[in-house]
Amino acid sequence: MKHIILGNGPAGVVAAETLRRAATGDDILLVGNEDAPPYSRMAIPYLLEGNIDERGTYLRKADDHFAKLRIRQRRGRAVAVDTGKRTILFDDGHFEPYDRLLVATGSHPVRPPIPGIDLPQVQTCWTLDDARAIAALAKPGSRVLQLGAGFIGCIIMEALIKRGVQLTVVEMGDRMVPRMMTPEAGSMIKRWVEKQGVRVVTKAGVERIENGEKSPLTVILS
């Protein structure tokens, strides 16, 4: 039997390893759409802090881990699935047949419909490529605006603080981490963050982003 797993994040990797234990003779193909080996997105802030290198984000450290388990790997993006014929079409035109298919592709960042959101200096923080781009832009002393001060936002914020940037954080809610913290707790976090030199703006959003005259970008708040 042939198993294909679309997505080589933690869920896909554990699924492939579990399948191998349960079906020692089956064909298992693990598919990811990035050049890097399977890695943990949750480790990216620690990469930005400099606590680990890129290899430290990898889910399995041994280079031959998947080969020893006879789990094949492929880089590509599935563009169509024919459940009748049980085939997958990849973006390079290649078809791959399967007996069982697991879709473990996870989620992706939502870019709010803000004019200028697609300018080159505007980054999400989701992939290793994102981390490389942020590291190239977020040099000590550079001015950075972070949109969002939720749980994940605060983890990324800490990494940016350690990079020595001049950081402004904009949060639409009335406090930091609004979905998890009470007003009192949110205020405590804000005071601590401001002591680290971060400017925090709550009850505000971004109206538009423009190319700046004296800096690469100008951000207009609403």
Identify the role of each PLM range.
Residues 1-72, 158-184:
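Beta1-alpha1 glycine-rich phosphate/pyrophosphate-binding loop at the start
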Residues 7-11, 126-127, 147-152:
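Glycine-rich Rossmann-fold phosphate-binding loop(s) that bind the pyrophosphate
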